[in-house]
UniProtKB/Swiss-Prot annotation:
Top-level EC class: transferase
Record-linked InterPro entries: ATP-Sase_PUA-like_dom, PUA-like_sf, Rossmann-like_a/b/a_fold, SO4_adenylyltransferase_pro, Sulfurylase_cat_dom, Sulphate_adenylyltransferase
Reactions accelerated catalytically: sulfate + ATP + H(+) = adenosine 5'-phosphosulfate + diphosphate
HAMAP family: Sulf_adenylyltr
Pfam families assigned to the protein according to its UniProt record, in alphabetical order: ATP-sulfurylase (PF01747), PUA_2 (PF14306)
Species the sequence originates in: Bacillus cereus (strain 03BB102)
Domain of life: Bacteria
Name of the protein this chain belongs to: Sulfate adenylyltransferase
Gene3D superfamilies per record: HUPs, Sulfate adenylyltransferase
Length: 378
């Protein structure tokens, strides 16, 4: 494992794989994890977790060496594949007929998935998308150090797909000493904009880092979201103080634990601060409104290496005639227009136009166009 904030780099496209015969098939989650492990997005991790680290992360939110890490990054294989593997050997990592990397197997073990579900997601309910995915994936985990031997060619957003070393360079070039990261899997609505701009008042730059890996089927498609971010930044943000780049990970929907994970990853991308809002990375009613903020009290800023910025739920207040939160607005609920991505999706699907207090008109236009395309192609 590398030291804090030193980036892992495990990309080697000249790596000789000609003598390696065995292979493990990667699903899309493992494939995106492979890339993020190799490019340093998941520093200090250098591979898929072995049993010791896996148990430690699941039980204590720390690696075996004590470093904070909250989400188990695992490589699941079927019992049949596991039987053909042994510790110490090198195996190719394959997806869609292409070899993307190699793993040096250190560990082959059967996890207690129920325990993982309960501790990581706080539920064993299979209606929870993270738990559902956990149970759907094969039942044996393979741990070991990896090498990425081939970069992905079919990247849907090449100009926005930057490795941590590149985003760090970009922030340096812009002279940003302090950078706040914002994680999103939804179009940015007025509530998000208010929070981002509040944070931008106290730091040099905003890093808008939308997740474009695997999400729930009813989440708005990544290409539509990317276009919505572009029009928003073009029209409503100072260009020299915002940087947009994608986060190619899968969404886990692990709420509080994922908030810690998202913060650690943004530290690797070069952020000094990270925004944690209401029900960060949550789904349904599985987590308390501010549970994702409360979990940070278990760790010091020093050991996280990044400062979390907590925001209350914001809304449009008809009396204040402005965006506000309970910290800044004295008025009652009856004056508050509550904004949420879910609400906007609902309005759009019913053919209604969200009011300008919800969403900027340029964003709404992009979403309507995207929804029409979805209906035609869907």
């Amino acid at each position: 494992m590398s030291t804090v904030n030193e980036l892992v780099n495990l990309v080697d496209e000249t790596y000789d794989i000609s003598q390696i015969e065995k292979e493990i098939g990667l699903d899309n989650i493992a494939l995106s994890d492979l890339e993020l492990l190799a490019t340093g997005g998941y520093s200090p991790l250098t591979g898929f977790l072995g049993k010791k680290d896996y148990d430690s992360v699941v039980e204590t939110l720390r690696l075996d060496n004590g470093s904070v890490w909250s989400i188990p990054i695992t490589l699941p294989v079927t019992e049949e594949v596991a039987k053909s593997l042994k510790s110490g050997e090198e195996v190719k990592l394959v997806n869609g007929g292409n070899v993307y990397g190699v793993i040096q197997i250190e560990d082959i073990f059967v996890p207690d998935k129920e325990k993982e579900a309960l501790l990581v997601y706080k539920t064993t309910d299979e209606a929870h998308p993270g738990v559902k995915k956990l149970y759907e994936r094969p039942n044996v985990y393979v741990g070991g150090a990896i090498v990425l031997t081939k970069r992905f060619e079919n990247n849907p957003f090449p100009s926005y797909h930057l490795d941590p070393i590149e985003t760090r360079e970009e922030f340096k070039k812009r002279g940003w000493k302090t950078v706040v990261g914002f994680q999103t899997r939804n179009p940015v609505h007025r509530a998000h904009e208010y929070i981002q701009k509040s944070a931008l008042e106290i730091v040099d730059g905003l890093f808008l880092n939308p997740l474009v890996g695997e999400t729930k089927s009813d989440d708005i498609p990544a290409d539509v979201r990317m276009e919505s971010y572009e029009v928003l930044l073009q029209n409503y943000y100072p260009k020299d103080r915002v940087f947009l780049s994608v986060f190619p990970a899968a969404m886990r929907y692990a709420g509080p634990r994922e908030a810690i994970f998202h913060a650690l990853v943004r530290k690797n991308f070069g952020c000094t601060h990270f925004i944690v809002g209401r029900d960060h990375a949550g789904v349904g009613d599985y987590y308390g409104t501010y549970e994702a903020q409360e979990i940070f009290t278990n760790f010091t800023v020093e050991e996280l290496g990044i400062t979390p910025l907590f925001f209350e739920h914001s809304f449009y207040c008809t009396k204040c005639e402005a965006m506000a939160s309970t910290k800044t607005c004295p008025h009652g609920k009856e004056d508050h227009v509550i904004l949420s991505g879910t609400k906007v999706r609902e309005l759009l699907r019913n053919g209604e136009i969200p009011p300008s207090t919800f969403s900027r008109k340029e964003v709404v236009e992009v979403l309507i166009k995207g929804l029409k395309k979805e209906v035609v192609t869907g």
